[in-house]
């Protein structure tokens, strides 16, 4: 997991076979190169990936959108807390909705919490006001 520039560090290490999921928080490569990562790093992904951004006011929003479009081989979700900006909701108690989204992702992947299927596969944002979400590359 990595926030902001830390997202590039995650992608720079995408080949690591120990990785079971990627969390790219308020980050994205787009067309840039930094921290040892570039758009080519997306080809090294081998596990499901969650991008979480903060709307068009988030400096990372356009790059996350480009990454989502470029990822073809692994399941990818782009969750957009449209009004939260680049800092997200992490300063709120317990990290706010952004932390809840990440927790639901981890529970869904690693604890097989089926109730989150609708959230991550069908975009059912019940309980997430002001969000949009899209996903692709999941096997049915």
For the regions a protein language model found, what residue spans apply to each?
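Conserved alpha/beta-hydrolase "nucleophile elbow" surrounding the catalytic nucleophile
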Residues: 1-4
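The feature captures the conserved acid-bearing segment of alpha/beta-hydrolase catalytic domains
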Residues: 15, 20-92
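Alpha/beta-hydrolase-fold serine-hydrolase catalytic core, especially in secreted/extracellular enzymes
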Residues: 74, 83, 92-140
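Short, solvent-exposed loop/turn elements at domain surfaces
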Residues: 9, 87-89, 116
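Short glycine-enriched nucleophile-adjacent loop
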Residues: 7-16
